[in-house]
Structure formats: C-alpha cells, structure tokens
Amino acid sequence: MQSLSLRAHAKVNMHLWVGARRADGLHSIESVMQRITLADSLSLSRLDIPGRCEVCSPYMALPRENTLTRAYARFCQVTGVHDGVRVRVVKRIPAGSGLGGGSADAAALLCGLDTLFGTTLSARVLREVAYSVGSDVPFFLASQAACVLGGGEQLVPLVPKTGYLGLLVWPGLHSGSAQAYEDLDRLRACGVHAADGEQYSLRGATALSAHYAQDCARWRFFNSLDAPVQRRYPVVALARWDLARAGACFTAMSGSGSXVFGLYRDEEELRRAHKLLAKRWCWCVRVRLCG
C-alpha cells in the first residue's frame, strides 16, 4: 500500500473529575468522553526518505515537533519500521479548544501507519504506544464513548449517546492543558473549592456509567477545570451561559477548554440556537454525537 486517507474525530468531555497530581506528574482523572462528527482529515503516503515524518497542514501552522511526529517516532521505535511518511492534515478541530484534536490526529496516524506498513500491531501494543504519545490518545483508537480513568490509560466502553445534537462554541482562545492543571493545583493549595459539582459522589466507572445512561437534563456531571479556566478566561463562562440561554438541555466545557458545548433534543431547537449564537461567536458549529 502506498497511501491512504483517514478521519480523526474530536471528542467532548461530558464529565471530568481531576484528582491530585501523581508521582509521574500526571493527575488522576475520571471522565466521560464521547466522539463527535467534527473531524480532521489525514492523508498518508510513503516517503522515500528513511526515518522522516513530513507533516503538511495547509490551513493551520503546526509546531515542528507535534503529536504526529511523536506518534511516528514511537511507532518506529516499537516496530523497527524506518520508512518515511508524508502526512497531510486538514485541520478543522481548533487547537487549544479541549476537543482533543492533537490526540485524535495521533491516534489516526498510528492506525494509519499500522495499515500502511502492514505491521499488524495488537490492540494492547497499539494502546501502549498511544499512551506513550499522550494520555488522551488511547481513547481515540477505538472508543466512541468511554469512561476514562487513571491517567487516561484505563478505558471502560459506554453505549454512545446518539439521541442528542450538539452545538460547539469556541471563543478563539488557546487554553493550554498544562496551564489549566497548574491553575487548579494553585486554587486547591489556597483552599478554593474548584468545582461546585465535586460535592456529588460520581466516582468510579459504575457510577459514571449509570449516570450517563440517564436523560441529559438529569446529569450532575461537572468539570474540575471549570473554575481555573474561567478565572483566567471569563469569556468561556459567557459562552457556556449563552448556550444555556439558547435552550441547551446540558452544557459543559470540554476538557481544559476553551470550547464549550450544548446538547439539544431536535433539529429545530439546534437550528434556532445556532442562528442566534452564530451572530455572537465567530466559531459556532453544529455536530452530532458519534455512535
């Protein structure tokens, strides 16, 4: 095989509890993630330069070292493959939005490299390689919806919610995950309760799965990073408030932000909300939940 094309779907966090920083520098998390129809497009082709991963992104500049180059390097280390590859990425998922664009791209590339070079890695090895690239990457290998636990390496599949439509609002801010977690640690060190929702006992995959199965209007999900991100970027709270006022039955910030999303029950509700919010926000996109 000389080339292939792939899609890398974004995700939203319905829920994100963040625990203390671990010895390895990561924080323990308990999250409910679901993939959505917003996606980047990747085209892979063989390159006659051994050990080279050439990344081209026509609409968004990428740093020289990124999740794609890291994924390629780790793939080569594990498989012994040294053939070069050219990757063309059409970015639709905003960077710094909490929608997992970089991780989704890395997961798609790993699957694509495995196919392109015929290495037939086992699911376990592929997950291990993915986790070494980034804590969110394993989720994007196969899951449509899952409880994500530990440092991101533990996945408990969920039956995807497909009965809702989504509206994304991105305020145009790059919210770095490292900064968000550092801000959360500082708030906690000062004794600030970081998320009102943390009073609820939504802990563990069993409790999260049962809660996720309910109607979204009954969800008590929360995001531990709400307080630190919204203190730094108040416009994120405004965007979420706008979604609620536009009739969303559930709203949340995804990951470490800065994108927020709302869930709607039918096309007409979604159409009205999109028409209203597109006048206020330059990036406002309708999506479906993948199932």
Curated annotation (Swiss-Prot):
GO terms for biological process: isopentenyl diphosphate biosynthetic process, methylerythritol 4-phosphate pathway; terpenoid biosynthetic process. Pfam families: GHMP_kinases_C (PF08544), GHMP_kinases_N (PF00288). Disulfide bonds: none annotated. GO terms for molecular function: 4-(cytidine 5'-diphospho)-2-C-methyl-D-erythritol kinase activity; ATP binding. InterPro entries: GHMP_kinase_C_dom, GHMP_kinase_C_sf, GHMP_kinase_N_dom, IspE, Ribosomal_Su5_D2-typ_SF, Ribsml_uS5_D2-typ_fold_subgr. Gene3D superfamilies: 3.30.230.10, GHMP kinase, C-terminal domain. The keyword DNA-binding does not apply. Pathway: Isoprenoid biosynthesis; isopentenyl diphosphate biosynthesis via DXP pathway; isopentenyl diphosphate from 1-deoxy-D-xylulose 5-phosphate: step 3/6. ATP binds at residues 94-104. Its EC number is 2.7.1.148. The active site is at 11, 136. Keywords: ATP-binding, Isoprene biosynthesis, Kinase, Nucleotide-binding, Transferase. It catalyses: 4-CDP-2-C-methyl-D-erythritol + ATP = 4-CDP-2-C-methyl-D-erythritol 2-phosphate + ADP + H(+). Belongs to the GHMP kinase family. IspE subfamily. NCBIfam families: ispE (TIGR00154). Catalyzes the phosphorylation of the position 2 hydroxy group of 4-diphosphocytidyl-2C-methyl-D-erythritol. This is 4-diphosphocytidyl-2-C-methyl-D-erythritol kinase. It comes from Treponema pallidum (strain Nichols).
